[in-house]
Each structure stands twice: as structure tokens, then as C-alpha cells.
Regions:
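Right-handed parallel beta-helix/beta-solenoid
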Residues: 1-20
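Acidic, glycine-rich low-complexity segments
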Residues: 41-43, 96
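Acidic glycine-/aspartate-rich tracts in secreted/extracellular proteins
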Residues: 11, 44-47, 102-103
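Extracellular beta-strand-rich solenoid/capping regions of secreted or surface-exposed proteins
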Residues: 18-35, 50-96, 105-123, 128-141
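Long, ordered, amphipathic alpha-helical scaffolds
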Residues: 1-5, 71, 249
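Right-handed parallel beta-helix
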Residues: 93-103, 118-129, 141-156, 160-161, ...
Length: 249
């Protein structure tokens, strides 16, 4: 009995649901959705972000993104950037975001499921050139991510003090959640691949990674803090590190 909406690059800002227009605005207001919803992605959804390099003095607001509802802040002299992210907040009705066919791509943007989202499924999507996180979850529960591909990210406006976002931030960062499964995903040359626990004091519960392929990845495969983690049948090929368990993980 789920509602279903289809999204293409041409309709990303015009699709309507629940009195909202544009896929960014629909999911940003997911707390207003009370029944199961399936969002079906067809083809490549592109922000069309320009590729010019930024610097530490760059201050660009509004005009970086081409999907309504995404974050668009790049702050000069700040410690961090946060743009081209879709913050999906408070979804409790049951949400699925899935690609249709073998060419469903999220290009130059990503998702963060936060503020007590629950019963979320993300499947059959390819994430590429994301400047921040590709598909992350914070303070949420019952999150199932499977059959997705994560290619290397790209952030040409990296103004962080560490200058470590050139390849994007995390592919699948999971912080402060419970009951998370990541399965049958492929990671290609990702840098800060998967962080579980943003600090030594944030606790997470019941994470499982299984049947994932880490192909030439650099780090955080995953990096875990304060979480009980079950990993099995994952394959690592030419990676910089492997599992990095810290802080009572």
C-alpha cells in the first residue's frame, strides 16, 4: 500500500507529493509523510554543479546546486563545507529510495538520513562525485542499504583545515544509529569509506556489513567506535587498510 513517485533528471524539481514540489523538498520534509513511500530514481539525477576549483577564501551561497532543497553553504574561513546534501529528516512512515534499472545514478550529491528516521531502505543506486557524504545516517534506526555502488567522491571547494575532502567525505557514514545493515554493495577507490561513530562518546548498536566488495579503497573499511559490529563475507582487494576498530567497538 505504499505511494510511489518516479523521479528523472527532468522532473527532479517539479515532481509533486504531499503538497510539496521537488524531490529535495519532499524528502527534506519526510517527517510530514505518514504512510509508506517508494521513491524510484530513473537515470542520472545530476546537480550540474560547476567544476571550478574553490579556495579557502571562497564564499559561495545559492547557485552551487541545481536541485531544490539541497544544502548549498560553502563558508569562507570556516572549518567545514556542507553542500549538495539532502537531509532527510524524521521519516517514520517507511521510506524506500531505489534505482530502476542498471543506470540509476546520484551524481554530485548525497543523502543524510537524520533526526530519528526509521524503517529506511536504499537500494540499486550508484553514487559518484559526491562532495560530502554519499549515503549517511545519523541518530536513526532500522536502516537497510544494499545493492548500491559507491565510486570516488569529488569536492573542488574543499575549504576544510585538513584539506581531506578532495575525494568527498564518507561513502557510508553511520553515526549514532541502531540496527543498520549494509549488504551487497561495491566500493570503488573510495577514500574515507565508512565511519561508524563520529566520536568516542557516541554509541551505536547492531551494525552488520555482509557481502560487500571493497575495491582499491583507501581507509575506514569501516572505522568503528562504540558499536557492536558483525562483518562477514566481505571481500577486500588492493585496499589501504581493513577493519579499524577503536573505542570499545
Amino acid at each position: 500500500n505504499a505511494d510511489v513517485i518516479y523521479v528523472t533528471n527532468e522532473t527532479k524539481n517539479t515532481v509533486t507529493y504531499n503538497g510539496l514540489t521537488g524531490i529535495g523538498n519532499i524528502l527534506k520534509n519526510a517527517s510530514r509523510i505518514s504512510k509508506p513511500l517508494a521513491v524510484r530514481i530513473i537515470g542520472t539525477i545530476d546537480t550540474q554543479t560547476r567544476d571550478a576549483d574553490g579556495t579557502k577564501t571562497t564564499d559561495i551561497n545559492n547557485g552551487v546546486v541545481a536541485i531544490d532543497g539541497l544544502t548549498d553553504k560553502i563558508i569562507s574561513n570556516g572549518k567545514d563545507s556542507y553542500f549538495n546534501m539532502l537531509d532527510v529528516t524524521g521519516s517514520k512512515g517507511g521510506l524506500t529510495v531505489e534505482g530502476i534499472g542498471d543506470d540509476a545514478n546520484i551524481l554530485k550529491w548525497g543523502f543524510t538520513f537524520k533526526s530519528n528516521c526509521q524503517d529506511v531502505e536504499v537500494r540499486n543506486l550508484t553514487f559518484s562525485k559526491y562532495p560530502e557524504d554519499a549515503c549517511a545516517a545519523e541518530n536513526s534506526k532500522y536502516f537497510w542499504l544494499h545493492n548500491c555502488v559507491f565510486n570516488i567522491g569529488e569536492n573542488k571547494y574543499d575549504i576544510t583545515e585538513e584539506q581531506d575532502k578532495g575525494d568527498g567525505d564518507g561513502a557510508t557514514d553511520m553515526n549514532g544509529n541502531s540496527n543498520v545493515t549494509i549488504a551487497y554493495c561495491r566500493y570503488n577507490q573510495t577514500h574515507k569509506t565508512s565511519l561508524n561513530g563520529g566520536s568516542d562518546s557516541v554509541k551505536s548498536y547492531n551494525y552488520t556489513y555482509h557481502h560487500n566488495f571493497f575495491n582499491g579503497c583507501k581507509s575506514r573499511l569501516p572505522l568503528t567506535r562504540q558499536v557492536n559490529l558483525h562483518m562477514y563475507n566481505n571481500y577486500y582487494l588492493n585496499c589501504g587498510t581493513c577493519i579499524d576498530a577503536r573505542a570499545s567497538a
